[in-house]
Amino acid sequence: MYLHKIAVNTEVFFMWNKIKQYLPTYIIGIAIPLTVGILAAALTRDSMDIYGTLKTPPLSPPAILFPIVWSILYVLMGISSAGVYSARELNPASASLGLKYYAVSLALNFLWSIIFFRLSAALPALICLIFLLYYIIRTIIEYIKVKPWCAYLQIPYAAWVVFAGYLNVGIWLLNQ
């Protein structure tokens, strides 16, 4: 019984050390996409009202749903990128490339908001979304070579961007 307690305590100790070691990485990993999202929202806040005036395609969710979904996605994206960064020694080339693709996807994500809302340019925003989806897929491909669960956390992001593409096309066609 005593040896079992020592083994459990040792395991808890090692687990706590691992958490302490990687916690800052995960906090930063989550903070990065959330900051990008907050910045994009702040820069497009005055233009968001346009969404309510547009003709939208079937299945268009209410505007209140977007910040909720994006917040969840940003947290998943941050956990995913932090997981790859923390395990980069497993496959340095794929980790590096995947994180670069992820950075490009964050930039495109930010640009889409500006193009669609601030510039009211649905077609250029759609082109931006196509590139965004490409970089998300590339990110997933590289992440899976490092930590598969990190790649899986990017799948909801890709799915939402496909849905955003559908909405973007619908808005573009219905509001010409």
Model-derived segments and their meaning:
Residues W16-G29:
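N-terminal membrane topogenic signal
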Residues P33-D49:
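Alpha-helical transmembrane segments of multi-pass membrane proteins
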Residues R45-L59, L90, N175:
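Membrane-interface helix termini and inter-helical loops of multi-pass transporters
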Residues T56-V69:
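Short aromatic-rich membrane-water interface segments that cap or initiate transmembrane helices
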Residues I144-Q176:
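Terminal transmembrane helical module of multi-pass membrane proteins
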